[in-house]
Each structure stands twice: as structure tokens, then as C-alpha cells.
């Protein structure tokens, strides 16, 4: 690979790193071609890009981004990067599920919305709610509040009418 090709790769990886909300470093040594293909398929289904890139090129690309240099600590051995653009948690869920069934895939580090997560924190990451799940929860909460408002207003009106009727009866008596 000549200097120009390396420069293009560095620029491309830097763009991906900047666009991604979640960047995950994995070690894949020992995985067969079919296992890597299966893993890539799972990532593609969630619109996650999974690329094998040389550590030195990733390190140089990181220098062109706002991602913490601490992520470079995970650049040892073979490295593949998962770029989560829309949902920063989705890659963690896939990596966790896949590595539970195949110990050859190892989670190294991640940067999720600027926060660095280390190897031992994959469970914590994978248990977080995804963006879609959070939106669903918020929408459900808002819906519950909105649907409760008419009942509350009706109860207040009913109590007011009842109180006015009692006052009218007392004055009539």
C-alpha cells in the first residue's frame, strides 16, 4: 500500500469516526471467514459499518477527530471497527450477543457520544436502551400523561359542580 492509498484510508476512517455516534474496537483473530461474514451481516441489518483497518491508520485517523486519544489504547493485535451512526448502542448489543456465542470475538474499547468504555464495560453498554427504545419510552410516558389529562379535568369539573350544587341546596334551605 503506497502513501497515497494510506492517506485516503486515513481520511475515510477519520470521516467515519467523526460521523459515528458509537465507535467500537474489536479483536477478531481466530474467527473464520464465514463467522466474520455472519457478524458483518448482523451489523449491516442494523446499519452499522464493520471494517478491518490497520492500527497505525486508525491511530492517525483519530488525530483528525474529537474522539479521545484514549481510544488508541485499544489498538493492539488485529482490530476491526464498528461504526454506529444512528444508534450508538446497537453495536454493543450485537458484539455482546455474538461474543457470548463465540469467544473468539473480543470487545476492546468503545467511544459512545464522547465517553470511553473499556473492555470490562461491554455488559453495561449492551444493557443501555437504544435510541429507538428511549424514544418509545418517552412517547409512552407522554401519551400516558396526555391521556390522563381529560380524566383529571373531568374529575375537577364534577367536583366543582357537586360543590356548587351543595352550596345551592344550603342557600335554598
UniProtKB/Swiss-Prot annotation:
It comes from the Bacteria. Pfam families: Ribosomal_L10. The keyword Glycoprotein does not apply. One of its GO terms (cellular component) is large ribosomal subunit. One of its GO terms (biological process) is translation. Keywords: Ribonucleoprotein, Ribosomal protein, RNA-binding, rRNA-binding. The keyword Acyltransferase does not apply. Signal peptide: none annotated. InterPro entries: Ribosomal_uL10, Ribosomal_uL10-like_sf, Ribosomal_uL10_bac, Ribosomal_uL10_bac_type, Ribosomal_uL10_CS_bac. One of its GO terms (molecular function) is structural constituent of ribosome. Belongs to the universal ribosomal protein uL10 family. HAMAP family: Ribosomal_uL10 (MF_00362). Forms part of the ribosomal stalk, playing a central role in the interaction of the ribosome with GTP-bound translation factors. Part of the ribosomal stalk of the 50S ribosomal subunit. The N-terminus interacts with L11 and the large rRNA to form the base of the stalk. The C-terminus forms an elongated spine to which L12 dimers bind in a sequential fashion forming a multimeric L10(L12)X complex. This is Large ribosomal subunit protein uL10. It comes from Chloroherpeton thalassium (strain ATCC 35110 / GB-78). The gene is rplJ.
Amino acid at each position: 500500500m503506497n502513501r497515497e492509498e494510506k492517506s485516503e484510508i486515513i481520511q475515510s476512517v477519520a470521516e467515519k469516526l467523526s460521523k459515528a455516534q458509537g465507535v467500537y474496537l474489536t479483536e477478531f483473530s481466530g474467527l473464520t471467514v464465514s463467522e466474520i461474514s455472519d457478524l458483518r451481516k448482523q451489523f449491516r441489518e442494523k446499519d452499522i459499518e464493520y471494517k478491518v483497518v490497520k492500527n497505525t491508520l486508525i491511530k492517525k485517523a483519530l488525530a483528525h477527530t474529537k474522539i479521545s486519544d484514549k481510544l488508541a489504547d485499544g489498538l493492539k493485535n488485529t482490530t476491526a471497527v464498528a461504526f454506529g451512526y444512528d444508534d450508538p448502542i446497537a453495536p454493543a448489543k450485537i458484539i455482546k450477543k455474538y461474543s457470548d456465542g463465540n469467544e473468539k470475538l473480543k470487545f476492546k474499547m468503545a467511544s459512545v457520544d464522547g465517553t470511553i468504555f473499556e473492555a470490562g464495560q461491554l455488559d453495561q453498554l449492551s444493557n443501555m436502551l437504544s435510541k429507538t427504545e428511549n424514544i418509545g419510552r418517552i412517547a409512552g410516558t407522554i401519551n400516558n400523561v396526555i391521556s390522563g389529562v381529560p380524566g383529571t379535568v373531568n374529575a375537577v369539573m364534577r367536583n366543582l359542580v357537586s360543590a356548587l350544587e351543595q352550596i345551592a341546596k344550603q342557600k335554598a334551605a
